[in-house]
């Protein structure tokens, strides 16, 4: 059974980092020095466990109004990022559950809009969850991305 938790200890944050390293660095070839960034220190980190094994991760960072083109009238923006699911649990709904947990946390924090930069191969996944792509394609760590946003509620 899979459980998603808001990381509440350094060990759980390290578990999130380990999942991200497996997916982004090992599998996708993102340089390790680009995978961890300055946003990690202020983020809410989420970890999905299959028993005791960490199998998914994601984070939420609160950004200023108007972040990456979001409507400034909606206030601060929840920046969903570093969503990663290990290969053995892909296709099980875990990615959807992680996004929903992060969105719920954003709503708890009083945020009305969530933005993310999606790898272009994942655009359909986020569109099915109500996100809308905008702006041109751009490179992030050697992978094509587009910005997406969703108003909560």
Describe the residue ranges of each PLM region:
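Conserved beta-strand in the GNAT
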Residues: 47, 53-70, 77-84
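Conserved GNAT acetyl-CoA-binding A-motif
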Residues: 99, 106-119
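C-terminal "cap" of GNAT-fold acetyltransferases
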Residues: 119-120, 139-153
